[in-house]
Regions:
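Right-hand nucleic-acid polymerase module
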Residues: 82, 86, 185, 189, ...
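Active-site-proximal segment of RNA-dependent polymerases
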Residues: 3, 89-147
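Conserved pre-motif C helix in the palm subdomain of viral-like polymerases
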Residues: 70-101, 190-217
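Glycine-/proline-rich flexible loop or hinge segments
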Residues: 21-33, 64-75, 101-103
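Reverse-transcriptase-like RNA-dependent polymerase core
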Residues: 47-69, 83, 168-184
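Non-catalytic, polymerase-adjacent accessory regions of viral genome-replication enzymes
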Residues: 1-44, 357, 400-420
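Conserved polymerase palm-domain catalytic core
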Residues: 123-227, 231-247, 251-253, 257-258, ...
């Protein structure tokens, strides 16, 4: 029997240790994870894969709300399958780096949306201040519309380099299966394309447009793609758009016409959860609303809370943990007036708890503002609450203070967080 290099790497103990640690963080059932720590379980899986008897179970669908009020269908795998597919996804990225173009930034360790947005802002500043500078676009139902032949071709390339593998057979079989359970637990059949929600969908989403990424990145301008979001800034932006549409048509795909936007240096536009205007970066409208909701539910919408409890809850949300709000937002957003508006809203929520008067207005988004994009709806109790309470809130460190700490060093920031 020929050696199966990919399967050997798949069952490397280091891969499983990392995957099980991820599983704990993702709240996969502990009894399932414990089973996977047993060597006999993994040996049985390997034996079944070699014999062609191992199958990924049909997923069940879930509806995830989108910013526009619609819902996105995702395919959720069973707990053990999530671990298996997660390892397979990591392995595919490791085995085939040449299938991933440098202009594609999604789903890769160490490259978050913030880094991409910061780079885009710098490029906007370098390009100039007048007229149309480029475009941003969104693929229409990318995860649902890629024909199976392109998915097969991606797996073919892996085996052409590393040899035939039982693991790739498992993945092919799963991607050729149309079976799933709907939200009412009814057994259904429908072509699922990349199967959004499946871990391997992230690798496929990155590599399937390699040729397009390469072609657009060679034009006169700056091109970047994050999954199904694309952006081009530079002189060749019209040529780039024509090429993009032609190449997508060749693959039976298309752009979402509602999401194509031409960019100017003096108008805010939204990209990857942020808003950009030249060298200025702030939050997108959906992220502003999420911020308001998260602060309110820990303060003025939390029954029987006290100021001390609310301050602790808000500090945890804003500052504590590796993936806290501050870590994701503050190194990227550079519009001080917008950050001040967010901070004033937080402090007004704290003051409302002290006075019991909670009509304090909300936060909004205006893309035509010259110096920012966040606006505040003034509530009738704001001025009175400020007059009746102290200027400082005990135990709360302001957004501006924590941003300065983060920009100084992560160690300074961590010291302040530890003091809360």
């Amino acid at each position: 029997m020929n050696e199966d290099k990919i399967l050997q790497m798949f069952f490397d103990i280091g891969q499983w240790t990392k995957a099980i640690e991820k599983g704990v963080l993702k709240d996969i059932r502990k009894d399932q994870l414990i089973r996977l720590t047993d060597e006999h379980t993994r040996m049985a899986m390997a034996y079944a894969m070699r014999r062609g008897k191992y199958e990924i179970s049909p997923p069940h669908t879930a509806q995830i709300p989108k910013d526009n009020g619609e819902f996105r269908t995702v395919y959720v795998n069973e707990p053990m399958d999530r671990v298996v597919l997660g390892i397979a996804n990591d392995l595919l990225f490791e085995l085939m780096p040449e299938m991933l173009h440098s202009s594609c930034k999604s789903y890769q360790t160490g490259i978050g949306c913030g880094k991409v947005v910061t780079e885009v802002s710098h490029r906007m500043t370098e390009t100039g201040n007048s007229g149309c500078l480029g475009w941003k676009s969104d693929l229409s139902k990318y995860f649902d519309s890629v024909p199976i032949r392109f998915i097969d071709e991606a797996f073919d390339k892996v085996e052409a380099k590393h040899g035939q593998s039982a693991l790739i057979d498992v993945l092919r079989k799963y991607y050729h299966s149309d079976l799933y359970f709907d939200e009412d637990n009814r057994f259904q059949s429908k072509y699922q394309s990349l199967k959004q929600g499946c871990a391997v969908a992230s690798w496929l989403a990155d590599v399937l447009l390699y040729d397009l990424d390469r072609e657009l990145s060679q034009m006169n301008g700056y091109y970047v793609r994050y999954s199904d979001d694309m952006l081009f800034i530079g002189k060749d932006y019209e040529k780039a758009m024509d090429t993009l549409q032609k190449r997508l048509e060749d693959k039976s795909m298309k752009l979402n016409p509602k999401k194509v936007e031409y960019l100017a240096a003096d108008v805010w536009f939204k990209f990857l959860g942020f808003s950009i205007k030249g060298g200025m970066v702030s939050l997108s409208s959906s992220r502003i609303k999420t911020f308001q909701h998260e602060i309110e539910r820990r303060t003025i919408r939390c029954r029987d809370t006290t100021l001390a409890k609310a301050v602790d809850a808000v500090n945890r949300y804003l500052y504590k943990g590796e993936f806290s709000w501050a870590i994701q937002v503050l190194p990227v957003c550079n519009v001080k007036s917008d950050l001040n508006e967010l901070n004033k809203f937080v402090m007004d929520c704290f003051r409302a708890i002290q006075t019991g008067r909670c009509k304090i207005g909300g936060l909004g988004y205006v893309r035509t503002k010259p110096d920012g994009c966040i606006v505040r709806g003034r509530g009738r109790n704001v001025k009175a609450n400020r007059d009746k309470t102290d200027r400082d809130i005990p135990g709360y460190l302001t957004v501006g203070c924590m941003r300065n700490a983060l920009l100084t060093s992560r160690a300074v920031y961590n010291t302040l967080v530890a003091s809360l």
